[in-house]
């Protein structure tokens, strides 16, 4: 059956389109509009809506296998579809760790029929221990799209060098969790005035940036493709900007909480505002916003990290790091468009086109013959995010009760409706 998305604003930066137009879909692909509309065609009237390539979140923790009490592939992809995402890349810090082809295959088999596509990311080191390399060829053959020890830094520079060399030989992307652990040890929020007032041990921005600089140096040495995860500070941005000027194969992401919140959110010892890297000051927040606009940062990803209530309802120092983000990312990111920081086309690049290119996966465009992964957005829809009504099992969000403007109203995966608001 032909599906017609009629009269929406089609924003497709890869094909340089930003115009009111119709999108036709059939058999899981985008097709060229026909002269006559078939009688059995399903038509959606989307006047006033944006029609964009399906959003892709390249940094998600689905917690499956092993920690399904926090999240599962089913609940995580349900939350993704509700947030407008047609695909997610899931991190390997599961139980067991995704460091073999068998775990990669389990994830892909369990994700069949899910509300969004799932792209497994394999571990850089066995067990995420940073001691020996994992089986890259085995994981790639099974379907892994990239490699990372996310959640843990690779402390050994020698091991990271070998990891990049091995990854390059298999044409695999390396994603870095950039953290110098001797500088961040026992820290639980940004080092600064707020931490001093609260009596909490801080984590300096240099704990992130010094490792970003190391990773960039090793990428230059090895020629490996490097992606810096969850960038939070000015110093990291400077290093990334310089790497790009030198033509190194380096890309980077940030998350909505880093351009929406500051470390003031921790006042009151709110554990829902605890994540790693931590929220920084207003100066860093503004720099992140500018870096999204000028191309220093390539991707908006959520770092969706669900936890159970008991893991957050403890004293701040002992609370788990991370927040859920799949259902708030789009609304928070659209604020950058309203503020004049981003154009709608640039936002689609950051949340769809560029993630697809970095991960070397299908999607990120609406050209004829492309997969029919499509997100429909109502940029004017005002709504209040309530964590109790969310689809994720995680209840850890500092945005609970926030009034947001703009949301996904329809999500299509391979031409099939996976979410309707």
UniProtKB/Swiss-Prot annotation:
Co-factor: note: Binds 2 Zn(2+) ions per subunit.
InterPro entries found in the cross-reference section: Amidohydro-rel (IPR006680), DHOase (IPR004722), DHOase/Allantoinase_Hydrolase (IPR050138), Dihydroorotase_CS (IPR002195), Metal-dep_hydrolase_composite (IPR011059), Metal_Hydrolase (IPR032466)
Protein keywords: Hydrolase, Metal-binding, Pyrimidine biosynthesis, Zinc
Residues of the active site: 303
Pathway note: Pyrimidine metabolism; UMP biosynthesis via de novo pathway; (S)-dihydroorotate from bicarbonate: step 3/3
UniProt superkingdom: Bacteria
Enzyme class: hydrolase
Cofactors (names): Zn(2+)
Catalytic reaction annotation: (S)-dihydroorotate + H2O = N-carbamoyl-L-aspartate + H(+)
Record-level GO BP terms: 'de novo' UMP biosynthetic process; purine nucleobase catabolic process
Enzyme Commission designation: 3.5.2.3
GO molecular function annotation: allantoinase activity; dihydroorotase activity; zinc ion binding
GO CC, alphabetical: cytoplasm
List of residues binding Zn(2+) 2: 150, 177, 230
Binding residue positions for Zn(2+) 1: 59, 61, 150, 303
Keyword Hydrolase: yes
Binding sites annotated in the UniProt record for substrate: 61-63, 93, 276, 307
Family: Belongs to the metallo-dependent hydrolases superfamily. DHOase family. Class I DHOase subfamily.
Function, in words: Catalyzes the reversible cyclization of carbamoyl aspartate to dihydroorotate.
Identification of the protein by name: Dihydroorotase
């Amino acid at each position: 059956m032909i599906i017609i998305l009629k009269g929406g604003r089609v924003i497709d930066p890869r094909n340089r389109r930003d115009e009111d137009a119709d999108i036709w879909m059939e058999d899981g692909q985008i097709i060229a509009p026909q002269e006559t509309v078939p009688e059995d065609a399903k038509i959606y009237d989307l006047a006033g809506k944006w029609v964009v390539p399906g959003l892709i979140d390249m940094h998600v923790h689905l917690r499956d296998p092993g920690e399904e009490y926090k999240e599962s592939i089913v609940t995580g992809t349900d939350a993704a579809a509700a947030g407008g995402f047609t695909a997610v890349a899931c991190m390997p810090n599961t139980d067991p760790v995704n460091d073999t082809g068998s775990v990669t295959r389990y994830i892909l088999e369990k994700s069949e029929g899910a509300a969004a596509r799932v792209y497994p990311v394999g571990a850089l080191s066995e067990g995420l221990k940073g001691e020996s390399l994992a089986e890259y060829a085995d994981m790639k053959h099974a379907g892994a799209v990239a490699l990372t020890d996310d959640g843990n830094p690779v402390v050994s520079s020698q091991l990271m060098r070998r990891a990049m060399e091995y990854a390059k030989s298999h044409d695999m992307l390396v994603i870095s969790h950039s953290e110098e652990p001797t500088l961040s040890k026992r820290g639980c929020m940004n080092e600064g005035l707020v931490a001093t007032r609260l009596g909490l041990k801080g984590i300096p921005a240099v704990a992130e940036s010094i490792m970003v600089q190391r990773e960039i140096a090793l990428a230059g040495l090895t020629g490996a493709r490097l992606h810096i995860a969850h960038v939070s500070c000015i110093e990291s941005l400077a290093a990334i900007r310089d790497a790009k000027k030198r033509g190194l194969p380096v890309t980077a992401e940030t998350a909505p909480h880093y351009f929406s919140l500051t470390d003031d959110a921790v006042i009151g010892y709110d554990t829902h505002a605890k994540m790693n890297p931590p929220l920084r000051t207003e100066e860093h927040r503004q720099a992140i916003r500018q870096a999204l606009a000028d191309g220093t940062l390539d991707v908006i990803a959520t770092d969706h990290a669900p936890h159970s209530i008991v893991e957050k309802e403890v004293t701040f120092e002992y609370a788990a790091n991370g927040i859920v983000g799949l259902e708030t990312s789009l609304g928070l990111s659209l604020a950058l468009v309203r503020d004049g920081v981003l154009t709608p086309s640039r936002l689609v690049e950051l949340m769809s086109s560029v993630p697809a290119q970095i991960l070397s996966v299908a999607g990120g465009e609406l050209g004829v013959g492309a997969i029919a992964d499509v997100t429909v957005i109502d940029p004017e829809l005002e709504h209040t995010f309530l964590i109790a009504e969310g689809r994720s099992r995680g209840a850890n969000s500092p945005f609970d009760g926030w009034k947001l403007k703009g949301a996904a109203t329809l999500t299509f995966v391979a031409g099939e409706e996976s979410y309707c608001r």
